[in-house]
């Protein structure tokens, strides 16, 4: 058992998310964020021998768990990488259309609670923050070279931090004296420059969130995968997404809204809306949030929102099909 496996992970909205997929015994499903396999194992329990489950994850520790599962269950295929490679990965596995795809966005509890990963200001550790520790630039490496303006924009846009400019200026001043290479060093700089405190929230929360999102390209990947899933879903197939903060939830909400209704017609158009093809998606029920009992058992579930869409027989607009090639 690796060190990360000693950290307790509670899958959020477990039954609700898998129920939303309406799993068919012979279906093909994708878990785009395997984590420690909570959603995947429940999907597998509902699949028959002819079913398949493809799981994605960037994190090498999560992939180790996924590969162990795949060795004991031949229905499982494993992809070590971000879900933005959705279509390319499915092509490589010889899979065409799928019956459903589930995404549990953001950071997992094992990643937060393993101090060595550098995601949390609760531990003094190397400032890494990469979900995939085998590739890419760490948070410390980026902070060492980013311009003050880039630091400000990332912290403001991805963390919605009011004091982003002051924090960016302080980072640039501090790194001129010594490297900012640990979580504690960064947290101390932020704390000294956030003038007002939010009740129950550490002053470093927004800055750490912002840098993590940027380093891992989290919002770009969400925006990239949604049209790919829409293109690959069978008619009646389901897309289920759990988001934990407003930035990623807004992307999902706007995407589903856009493709579940017709674009407004100009007044001069010689066609009625009723004569247009059916939109490619329809919203499947209202957005769901965890109940009081789940939040009491797992306070980190508090901000979760589950949105579900279903593929219709409607055609997919050409521009959406073109967008899917950008990440292939």
From Swiss-Prot:
Name of the protein in question: Ribosomal RNA small subunit methyltransferase H
Pfam families: Methyltransf_5
Reaction(s) this enzyme catalyzes, per UniProt: cytidine(1402) in 16S rRNA + S-adenosyl-L-methionine = N(4)-methylcytidine(1402) in 16S rRNA + S-adenosyl-L-homocysteine + H(+)
UniProt-listed NCBIfam families: 16S rRNA (cytosine(1402)-N(4))-methyltransferase RsmH
HAMAP family referenced in this protein's UniProt entry, alphabetically: 16SrRNA_methyltr_H (MF_01007)
GO molecular function, one term: rRNA (cytosine-N4-)-methyltransferase activity
Key words of the record: Cytoplasm, Methyltransferase, rRNA processing, S-adenosyl-L-methionine, Transferase
Class of enzymatic activity (EC top level): transferase
Residues reported in the UniProt entry to bind S-adenosyl-L-methionine: 37-39, 57, 83, 104, 111
GO cellular component, one term: cytoplasm
UniProt family annotation: Belongs to the methyltransferase superfamily. RsmH family.
GO biological process: rRNA base methylation
């Amino acid at each position: 058992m690796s060190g990360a496996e000693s950290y307790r992970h509670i899958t959020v909205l477990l039954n609700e998310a898998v129920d939303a997929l309406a799993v068919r015994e012979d279906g093909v499903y994708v878990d785009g964020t395997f984590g420690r396999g909570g959603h995947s194992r429940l999907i597998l329990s509902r699949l028959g021998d002819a079913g398949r489950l493809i799981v994605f994850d960037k994190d090498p520790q999560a992939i180790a768990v996924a590969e162990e599962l795949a060795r004991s269950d031949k229905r499982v295929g494993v992809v070590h990488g971000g879900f933005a490679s959705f279509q390319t990965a499915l092509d490589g596995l010889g899979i065409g259309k799928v019956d459903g795809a589930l995404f549990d966005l953001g950071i997992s509890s094992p990643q937060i609670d393993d101090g060595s990963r550098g995601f949390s200001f609760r531990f003094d550790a190397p400032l890494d923050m990469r979900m995939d520790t085998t590739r890419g630039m760490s948070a410390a490496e980026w902070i060492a070279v980013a311009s003050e303006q880039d630091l400000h924009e990332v912290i403001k846009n991805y963390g919605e931090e009011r004091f982003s400019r002051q924090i960016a200026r302080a980072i640039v001043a501090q790194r001129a004296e010594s490297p900012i290479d640990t979580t504690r060093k960064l947290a101390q700089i932020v704390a000294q420059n956030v003038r007002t405190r939010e009740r129950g929230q550490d002053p470093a929360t927004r800055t750490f969130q912002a840098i993590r999102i940027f380093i891992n390209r989290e919002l770009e990947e969400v925006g990239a995968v949604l049209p790919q899933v829409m293109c690959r879903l069978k008619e009646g197939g389901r897309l289920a997404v759990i988001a934990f903060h407003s930035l990623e939830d807004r992307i999902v909400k706007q995407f589903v809204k856009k493709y579940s209704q017709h674009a407004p017609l100009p007044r001069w158009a010689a066609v009625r809306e009723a004569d247009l093809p059916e939109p490619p998606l329809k919203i499947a029920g209202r957005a769901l949030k965890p109940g009081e009992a789940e939040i009491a058992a797992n306070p980190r579930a508090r901000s979760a929102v589950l949105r579900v869409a279903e593929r219709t027989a409607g055609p997919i607009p050409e521009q959406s099909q073109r967008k899917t090639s950008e990440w292939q």
